[in-house]
Design a protein with these regions (language model features):
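N-terminal Rossmann NAD(P)H-binding glycine-rich loop of SDR-like oxidoreductase domains
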Residues: 2-24
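Residues at the starts of beta-strands that form the adenosine-phosphate
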Residues: 3, 27-30, 95-96, 141
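NAD(P)H-binding glycine-rich loop region in Rossmannoid oxidoreductase-like domains
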Residues: 4-5, 16, 31, 36-92, ...
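Active-site-lining helix/loop region of Rossmann-like oxidoreductase modules
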Residues: 7-12, 153, 159-213
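Residues in the short beta-alpha loop(s) of Rossmann-like NAD(P)-binding domains
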Residues: 10, 35, 103
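A generic structural motif
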Residues: 24-29, 193
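Short, well-ordered secondary-structure micro-motifs
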Residues: 41-43, 63, 109-111, 155-157, ...
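Glycine-/Pro-rich loop/turn segments that contact NAD(P) or position catalytic residues
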Residues: 77-162
Length: 213
């Protein structure tokens, strides 16, 4: 039985992911966040464990990793945190890591949309290039998800993925679609997602900027 630790479990993608995993799998879930007990609404206490913690609190992080098979990190923004997470995984022998980050960290967003994207989030991209490098230099079976601009739509779970070295595929993707992809990665037993950095977008959204801007 697989146990998944969700770091940043109060985040929007995380909350969609939890409901998807409860519905589509029998995995046990550890939900780690600041003030988690106040912010997270547990629907299945037999499968969900809530952990109040901070990524920089090495002790709580290490305890949370016990008996975990996979880790999902909802936000790859903070370099010291990402380093601590990798160390805690190594200390506990946890191999599978999935991390959500922004598009543009591999200079893969081309054309007018690429220029717009850089003008909007250049400092975010610069910061997240560093966290991605830490993950890629680790010995983890990582899947880095470079996400298009996000929106919410329960009825729209369409996504497509591009590999490292391919131009990014579109401007936007729903958080629900991202949760569906993460669930597919966690359920996969072939290893095809290991040590991959994937661009994620909704098909047929190749615009100059997201449709909601």
């Amino acid at each position: 039985l697989k146990t998944v630790l969700i770091l940043g479990a109060a985040g929007q993608i995380s909350s969609y992911l939890v409901s998807e995993l409860l519905k589509e799998t029998d995995f046990k879930l550890k939900l780690f966040a600041r003030n988690a007990t106040k912010r997270i609404n547990v629907t299945d206490p037999s499968r969900e464990t809530v952990i109040d913690g901070d990524f920089n609190d090495t002790q709580t992080l290490t305890i949370a990793m016990k008996d975990v098979d996979a880790v999902y990190l909802n936000e790859m923004r903070d370099l010291p945190s990402v380093k601590k997470i990798v160390s805690a995984m190594d200390d506990n022998g946890v191999k599978q890591f999935i991390g959500a980050t922004v598009l543009g960290i591999e200079d893969e967003v081309k054309g007018a949309f690429g220029n717009w994207n850089t003008s909007m989030i250049e400092s975010s991209i610069t910061r997240r290039k560093k966290t991605a490098a830490v993950i890629k230099d680790s010995d983890l079976d990582y899947t880095i998800l470079r996400l298009a601009w996000l929106f919410n739509d329960d009825k729209n779970t369409a996504y497509e993925i591009t590999d490292s070295g391919q131009p990014f595929g579109g401007t936007e993707v729903s958080r629900q679609a991202v949760a569906k992809l993460i669930t597919a990665i966690l359920k996969d037993e072939t290893g095809k997602y290991a040590r991959q950095s994937l661009g994620v977008n909704e098909p047929n959204t190749n615009f100059d900027k997201p449709s909601f801007y």
